[in-house]
């Protein structure tokens, strides 16, 4: 039985409606999948950017922390150097004051004579030369001459050696120094400096750990004394 035009049109409409419905469902499915993929990609991008931002600020925070440590270390080093300079300045001032007080020793002739006796004899013992030359300040010549005359017999007995000791009257020590003597061997190539300043410097060097300890306290980081 042949279909009428109305039936054909009805079937065509039904098929078109089915195709349209299927197309709409497919389009909705594609849209949903596309939206899902978009949201996933958007979330991935957001997470990636969030991680990048976090890494950036973590790196910046570490850099700032490192800069703080370096700056703090520099400040502590500068402060430590200032303290050391202040301590050195104080010790230098004390030594300068001690050198100025040496003039009081020289003014006491009796005391100074005893000191010169010891300095001359000590210098002779240090050189142990057959011929030695003593140099002094011009104003100390009489005292040094007396010291040499006392030292020679003592030296001979102690060393069992003969010795010729002369006082240099051509070149004297500067008048500006506090006092004391310099003693040379015969050809003046070897010298023992026993001026008051040189003896004070030597004592200061030997006693420096004790001086620092008395002024500033013991150094906890120091295991050995100089």
Swiss-Prot record:
Tissues showing expression: Expressed in brain (at protein level).
Keyword Membrane: yes
Record has Metal-binding as a keyword: no
Residues annotated with Phosphotyrosine modification: 56
GO function terms (MF aspect): proton-transporting ATPase activity, rotational mechanism
Primary location: membrane
UniProt keyword list: Acetylation, Cell membrane, Cytoplasmic vesicle, Hydrogen ion transport, Ion transport, Membrane, Phosphoprotein, Synapse, Transport
Membrane topology classification: Peripheral membrane protein
Location within or outside the cell: Apical cell membrane; Cytoplasmic vesicle, Secretory vesicle, Synaptic vesicle membrane; Cytoplasmic vesicle, Clathrin-coated vesicle membrane
A Pfam family per the record: vATP-synt_E
GO CC term, one of those recorded: synaptic vesicle membrane
Modified residues (N-acetylalanine): 2
Subunit-level organization: V-ATPase is a heteromultimeric enzyme made up of two complexes: the ATP-hydrolytic V1 complex and the proton translocation V0 complex. The V1 complex consists of three catalytic AB heterodimers that form a heterohexamer, three peripheral stalks each consisting of EG heterodimers, one central rotor including subunits D and F, and the regulatory subunits C and H. The proton translocation complex V0 consists of the proton transport subunit a, a ring of proteolipid subunits c9c'', rotary subunit d, subunits e and f, and the accessory subunits ATP6AP1/Ac45 and ATP6AP2/PRR.
Function: Subunit of the V1 complex of vacuolar(H+)-ATPase (V-ATPase), a multisubunit enzyme composed of a peripheral complex (V1) that hydrolyzes ATP and a membrane integral complex (V0) that translocates protons. V-ATPase is responsible for acidifying and maintaining the pH of intracellular compartments and in some cell types, is targeted to the plasma membrane, where it is responsible for acidifying the extracellular environment.
HAMAP family reported in the protein's UniProt record: ATP_synth_E_arch
Family stated for the protein in its record: Belongs to the V-ATPase E subunit family.
Protein name, per record: V-type proton ATPase subunit E 1
Gene of this entry: ATP6V1E1
């Amino acid at each position: 039985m042949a279909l009428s035009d109305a039936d054909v049109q009805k079937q065509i409409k039904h098929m078109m409606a089915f195709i349209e419905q299927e197309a709409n469902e497919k389009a909705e499915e594609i849209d949903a999948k596309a939206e899902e993929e978009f949201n996933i990609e958007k979330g991935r991008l957001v997470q990636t950017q969030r991680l990048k931002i976090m890494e950036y600020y973590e790196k910046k925070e570490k850099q700032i922390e490192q800069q703080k440590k370096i700056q703090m270390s520099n400040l502590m080093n500068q402060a430590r150097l200032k303290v050391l300079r202040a301590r050195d300045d104080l010790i230098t001032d004390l030594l300068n004051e001690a050198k100025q007080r040496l003039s009081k020793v020289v003014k006491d002739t009796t005391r100074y004579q005893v000191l010169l006796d010891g300095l001359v004899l000590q210098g002779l013992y240090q050189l142990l030369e057959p011929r030695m030359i003593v140099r002094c300040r011009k104003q100390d010549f009489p005292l040094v001459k007396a010291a040499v005359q006392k030292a020679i017999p003592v030296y001979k007995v102690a060393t069992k050696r003969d010795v010729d000791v002369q006082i240099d009257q051509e070149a004297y020590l500067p008048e500006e120094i506090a006092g004391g003597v310099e003693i040379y061997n015969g050809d003046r190539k070897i010298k023992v400096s026993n001026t008051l300043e040189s003896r004070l410097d030597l004592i200061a060097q030997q006693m420096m750990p004790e001086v620092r300890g008395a002024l500033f306290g013991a150094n906890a980081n120091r295991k050995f004394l100089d």
